[in-house]
Amino acid sequence: MDVTRTRSLRLAAAGVAAALSIAALAACSPGPAGAGDAKTDAGVLTVAASAAVTTWDPVASFSTEALYMGNIYEPLLWKNAEGSSQEFTPAIAKSWTTSDDGLTWTFDIRKGVTFHDGEKLDADAVVKSIQAAQERAGASFIWTPLESIEATDDATVVMHLKYSAPMDLVAASTYGAWIVSPKALAASASDDKYFEKGVDAGTGPYTLDSYDPGSKVVLKAYDDYWNEDEAPTYGIVDISITPDAVTAQQMLTAKEVDFATTVPLENIDDVAAQMDGKVRTANSPFNYVGYFNTLRPPLDDPKVRQALSYAVPYQDLIDVGVQGYGTQAHGPVPKGIFPYSEDVPQYSYDLDKAEALLAGAGHPDGFTLKLTYASENPAEARFVPLIKDSFAKIGVNVEVTAELFNQQWEKAKSDPANAQDIFIVYYWPTYSDAGSDNLNSLFHSSEKPFFNLSYWKNADYDALIDKAGTLTGSDRSAAQADYVKAMGMLYDQAPGLYLFDAQAVTVVPNALKIAPFNENYPFTTFFAPIEPAA
């Protein structure tokens, strides 16, 4: 398994995903099984959606086509949004248990479910799907803890792990965890273009009815969907692929579509008023961090890094960068995602304290730093000048360079000694465990820099998050406590600036009822729960 390659694919898409930081997200959660009334066909739901399709292969999928995948395919279980009464909702698995040591996970597979191609769902189909994900998924690395998997009977799947890990979170991932018809998996193994013909092989509430590349996706309600109580209200979802948020806004306000997944944030209140709707905000998994180059003076001194952390006007960055739709970060773990904690301290905006720390570190006259950000991220383009201006007030000159993300990233990895001093990054976890992802990927020591672009190495921090990672599957509260300690170290040592968590913002037209946004599936708009308001 090439972890570097698969994770780099996700980061390489950061420029595309950056549009989310300036657009209104319109996504909602899948409903809990059995929670709704039987539904009737409301006809056609028309949608303007920004998400492009890079592949229809549910195993390889690792990009914005997740918007559609979550309607066609299902995982073993769904991770519910923060604040839900239950952490998970059963999907393909009716129930699951784990051994006390967290090394064995047993899933009870739902009976009476069929794939869209007519194949029957059973435990063997689940095993084949997960084995395919291990071998070739874009997010194959999420299955790294899995030693072996077996179907002990038609309705039971047992996972044996190399080390304790949170397989409930892994099994609920938005990437690399879809359960796929074994017939389609076999066909795609001999024909890598099999799914690109418009084939789908999921168990979800919708089937892929048609696809016009770059233009239109049409989904059709699946007549034999297993969950009758949560069957779609709309028999057809007609989606116009509309990458430009302004165009989507125009289509929505002109009533050419019922719903738009992206609207420019600066226009969101006006759009809601025109639609006689409302603006709804929620957590999202998107987080902004500014790496310090801890290998090069003066940023090799924690006191200097702390001083600069006090010189960031955090609320101004939120107000200007994302129109106020964000919250100051408590470290690099976004709000609503494990192991987020408000017990993790934050730096305040305090120029007097910043100046005093700089003087105490031997830099009363300041110095010059080089800062880079992704040119394709308009939110960064808006808020980076505020950092430059504020640092100037304490005598620190910042030379700003905008580069395509991949260019910025390659330079940062290749020669840390001559790289940037500050690297702004827009990041989100692959699945709902920011301990194994954000805290590990962004700040764990590595022989060669890949994600840890602060180049920071701290053996105590490494040991703490390594330990926490082995506890998450068996004792999540203990893991949480260790992760919070680790984030306290990040605050004290300040290898990065922990800027803000972006919020998800939804325009809810008055003609529709839309379920709340789920931060665990940020790229997916779940269409089945959408209903006419009247």
Model-derived regions, located:
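Gly/Pro-rich hinge or "lid" segments in bacterial periplasmic/extracellular proteins
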Residues: A81-G83, T174-D229
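A bilobed periplasmic-binding-protein/Venus flytrap-type ligand-binding module shared by bacterial periplasmic
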Residues: K79-N80, K220-D224, S284-A307, A311, ...
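Detector for C-terminal structural segments
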Residues: D212-K216, V312-F338, A379-L386, K413-A534
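Aromatic- and charge-enriched surface segment that lines or borders ligand/interaction sites
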Residues: K94-A137, T152, V158-Y163, P298
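N-terminal lobe/hinge region of extracytoplasmic solute-binding protein
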Residues: A48-D100, Q131, A201-G202
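Ligand-site clamp/hinge motif
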Residues: D223-D270
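Append "and occasionally in soluble cytosolic enzymes with long acidic Gly/Pro-rich linkers
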Residues: D300-D389, I394, K457, P532-A533
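Surface-exposed binding/hinge segments that line
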Residues: D108, F141-A186, S210-D212
